Structures are given as structure tokens and as C-alpha cells.
Amino acid sequence: MTDVEDIVAKIKGIFLNPVETFQESRDDPQGMIITYFAVILLVNSLLHTIVIYLQAGSYMGGLSPTGPGGVFFIFVFAVLSSLVMSALFVLWLHLWVYILGGRKGLIQTAKAFVYGATPEFLLGWIPYIGIIFLIWSFLLGVLGVRELHEISTARAAVALVIAIVIPLLLLLFVSLYLISHLNTIPAAAYTP
């Protein structure tokens, strides 16, 4: 099979038969994972860019402030930020998987994340219902960690929950701190 056929088959498997697909993915080479992730990342970034561009125009009465250069910037930012955040999340997730008994290696954690994130990356860009695909990807992530690290569903779920909740709590506390300090900044004196 070609790379395209492999990727389409993997996507179909993740959507229709995820447990079997994860089990068959244990020996996937790193090149396959990288190619697969690159494809879903580029599709996700392109579709997010289109949605952001269209929504920006609707908020501005049809006048989009982004222009052609802005569209390119949004796309590049989406690709780079998704790439960096995904890599950091895989490392962070692997720490918790390891603590909870997963000993099959970082590559298996990367596979669980990449393949599990398929619904979010391919369909999460859809306004208003994207959250459904985020939840679906979370559940697939649990299955992926369970199957690829051969640990219990409970341990896999706890690893994912911890890996998600701690950064969210940190973000919340930082946001609250910044908001509370913005209220203490004196306003500039108004002089007509």
C-alpha cells in the first residue's frame, strides 16, 4: 500500500474499529506516525485557518482584517503552535503514563496521542460541535494508552486526566492572578 492508502486505512480504522487499530499499530514505524501526524496536522491547520478567516469577516461586517498575509500567518501559526503543543503534551502525558505503569516507551505514547487525536484534528475545527470530537479524542486516547502500553483502562484514564487537568488548573490560576492584578493598574489620567 502507498502512504496515502495507509493513512486512509488508519483513519478509517480509528473511526470504525479503534481497539483493533491500536493493537495493529504497536509495530508501526516512526515514519508512519510522523507522516500520519503531518497529514492530520496540515488538514486541521488549513480548516482552522479557513474558519478563523470566515469568522473574522463575519464579526467585522464582512470586512476581514486578516488579508492574504494574515491568512498565511494564521496558517503558519496554527501549524507551529499545534506541533509544539502536541510534542510537549506527548512528553507530559508520557511522564504520567510511566508513573502509572506504562513501560512500552515514548513512541507508544506518541502513537496513542497521534492516532487518538484523529477526530479532533480532522473534525474539531467545526464550530459549535467541535467539543464532541475533542471528547471522542480523549476517549480514544484512553484506549490508545491502554492498548499500546498494556495497562488498565483506569490507569490510562487517570494518566490522561492528570496530563490534561494540571495544565488547565495552572492556566486558570495564572489567568486569575493576571486578572486580579489588571484591576490594580491605575488608569491613565484623562486630559482633554
Question: Where are these predicted regions, by residue range?
Answer:
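Selected alpha-helical membrane-embedding segments in polytopic membrane proteins
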Residues: T2-L100
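Weak global preference for isoleucine
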Residues: I7, I11-I14, I33-I34, I40, ...
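Perimembrane helix-loop junctions in membrane proteins
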Residues: E24-D27, I52-M60, Y98-G105, G144-I151, ...
